[in-house]
Amino acid sequence: MEHFRNIGIIGRLGSTQVVDTIRRLKRFLLDRHLHVILDEGIAELLPGHGLQVSSRKQLGEVCDMVVVVGGDGSMLGAARALARYKVPVLGINRGSLGFLTDIRPDELETRVAEVLDGQYTVESRFLLETQVRRKLEPIGQGDALNDVVLHPGKSTRMIEFELYIDGQFVCSQKSDGLIVSTPTGSTAYALSAGGPIMHPKLDAIVIVPMYPHTLSSRPIVVAGNSELKIVVSPKMDIYPQVSCDGQNHFTCSPGDIVTISKKPQRLQLIHPLDHNYYEVCRTKLGWGSRLGGGS
């Protein structure tokens, strides 16, 4: 008996390798007599596929599982669209790093079969939601699985802002920006800026200054339920941006307020049974092996 009957497929656009992998996946799923639904974006690259085509909203509503073929960027986009529907998501890596996409293309059939047969675990990952307000009126909002970043945009000048956590003033800062990251995003941009690696099961948020003018400004780890408020200095004459996962962007004006908090809905991420977070870090980040040559 199949654990999943209606399988959605999302793929990264502009890659022939992704298209080839999706064709393999489609054949494999159809051979198991499953109902396969293609995301409308990737369907155009598969002429004559003969399958149902749906929007991501519809995939979330009708699918038992969605398979994302691509890299971490593809998974980030899918996560933001699908988290609200609680549909579990499985990743096949066709990118460079693959922190979120576990399955290698060469093991596609074997690994997907294991998942279909019930040999998998589901890990819950929380997202952040952010809103930009101008004179109390919302002008932009978005979600992020990795991080919300305040940055100068096209300017090379520093940003001035104030940070509040749960209504309490923390600091005023002059820097290149601020990264607010989930545990999932702690191995991404936040890591490059000197932030700590956080296990994805942690209920915490890390706040990482980007090249702060004050050297004592260090990363801060706060409770996952914290509510953050960033007040962009009204004295500035530049217009910084807020980016969600580096994919969605909003332009701020001096005096704007950026709020960031945990999103109620979570991503349900499927892993093979032998998934090992520390092995992923060791492989992707180039950590050393055990003494004596062991892995």
UniProtKB/Swiss-Prot annotation:
Catalysed conversion reaction: NAD(+) + ATP = ADP + NADP(+) + H(+)
Top-level taxonomic group: Bacteria
Protein residues bound to NAD(+): 72-73, 146-147, 157, 174, 176, 187-192, 247
GO terms of biological process kind: NAD metabolic process; NADP biosynthetic process
Pfam families the UniProt entry points to: NAD_kinase (PF01513), NAD_kinase_C (PF20143)
Keyword ATP-binding: yes
GO molecular-function terms, A-Z: ATP binding; metal ion binding; NAD binding; NAD+ kinase activity
GO CC field: cytoplasm
Compartments, as annotated in UniProt: Cytoplasm
SUPFAM superfamilies (UniProt xref): NAD kinase/diacylglycerol kinase-like
Coiled coil, from the record: none
Keyword annotations of the record: ATP-binding, Cytoplasm, Kinase, NAD, NADP, Nucleotide-binding, Transferase
Cofactor(s) for this UniProt protein: a divalent metal cation
Active-site residue list: 72 (proton acceptor)
EC number per UniProt: 2.7.1.23
HAMAP family to which the protein is assigned, alphabetical: NAD_kinase
NCBIfam families: PRK01231.1 (NF002306)
Task performed by this protein: Involved in the regulation of the intracellular balance of NAD and NADP, and is a key enzyme in the biosynthesis of NADP. Catalyzes specifically the phosphorylation on 2'-hydroxyl of the adenosine moiety of NAD to yield NADP.
Recorded family membership: Belongs to the NAD kinase family.
Name by which UniProt lists this protein: NAD kinase
Organism: Azotobacter vinelandii (strain DJ / ATCC BAA-1303)
Originating gene: nadK
